[in-house]
C-alpha cells in the first residue's frame, strides 16, 4: 500500500513490536502490536501502526498528509447514520470483520484479474508488486528482531 500511495519504492524500514495485550501470541514468537516506519529515496516517510486488538470492531484507517492538505479514509460502520446530541456523536459499530468490509473490493479485484487475463493484459497489482510487498515484510521482520533499521 505504501508503494502504491507514494509511487515510490521504500529504501529503509524500521519495525518494533510487542505482545502485551495477548502474551500467548508472544509465546508463539509473534506480536499483537507493531509500529513500522518506512522511508523512500526522496525522503517520504510512511508510518504504520498495527494492533490485533480493537474491542470496537475492525479498525483500519488511512491518512495521507501533503503540502496541499490531508486526505483520510475512515472506518466503515454498519450504517452511515450518525446521531449528534448533548453527549456527543453516536454511530453504529464499525464492521467487525475484514470479509464484511472488503467483500466488494475482493469481488472487484477478482473481476479485474479475470478480465486482464482474458484480454492478455497484466493485472494490477503485478507479481512484482507482490514480490516487493514480501521483501518489505521480510525486512520488517528482520528489523523487529534486531532492533535496527534495514536498508533496502
Residue ranges and their predicted role:
Residues 1, 9, 60, 109-112:
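Hydrophobic alpha-helical segments typical of transmembrane helices
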Residues 1-45, 51-56, 128:
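Rossmann-like dinucleotide-binding domain that binds NAD(P)(H)
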Residues 4-8, 67-71, 143:
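Phosphate/oxyanion-binding loops and surfaces in catalytic or ligand/nucleic-acid-binding neighborhoods
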Residues 34-36, 60-62, 141:
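Residue-level detector of beta-strand structural context in well-folded domains
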Residues 41, 115-152:
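C-terminal helix-rich "cap/oligomerization" subdomain common to oxidoreductases
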Residues 68, 110, 134-137:
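Short amphipathic alpha-helical/adjacent loop interface patches that line ligand
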Residues 32, 106-109, 126, 132:
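An acidic site on a long C-lobe helix of protein kinase domains
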Residues 22-28, 40-108:
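NAD(P)-dinucleotide binding in Rossmann-like oxidoreductases
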Amino acid at each position: 500500500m505504501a508503494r502504491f500511495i507514494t509511487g515510490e519504492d521504500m529504501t529503509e524500514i524500521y519495525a518494533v513490536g510487542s505482545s502485551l495485550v495477548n502474551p500467548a501470541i508472544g509465546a508463539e514468537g509473534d506480536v499483537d502490536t507493531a509500529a513500522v516506519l518506512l522511508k523512500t529515496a526522496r525522503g517520504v516517510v510512511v508510518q504504520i501502526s498495527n494492533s490485533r486488538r480493537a474491542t470496537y470492531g475492525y479498525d483500519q484507517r488511512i491518512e495521507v498528509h501533503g503540502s496541499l492538505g490531508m486526505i483520510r479514509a475512515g472506518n466503515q460502520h454498519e450504517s452511515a447514520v450518525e446521531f449528534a446530541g448533548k453527549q456527543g456523536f453516536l454511530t453504529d459499530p464499525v464492521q467487525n470483520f475484514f470479509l464484511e468490509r472488503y467483500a466488494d473490493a475482493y469481488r472487484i479485484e477478482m473481476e479485474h484479474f479475470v478480465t486482464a487475463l482474458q484480454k492478455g493484459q497484466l493485472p494490477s497489482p503485478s507479481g512484482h508488486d507482490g514480490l516487493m510487498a514480501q521483501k518489505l515484510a521480510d525486512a520488517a521482520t528482520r528489523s523487529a528482531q534486531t532492533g535496527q533499521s534495514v536498508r533496502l
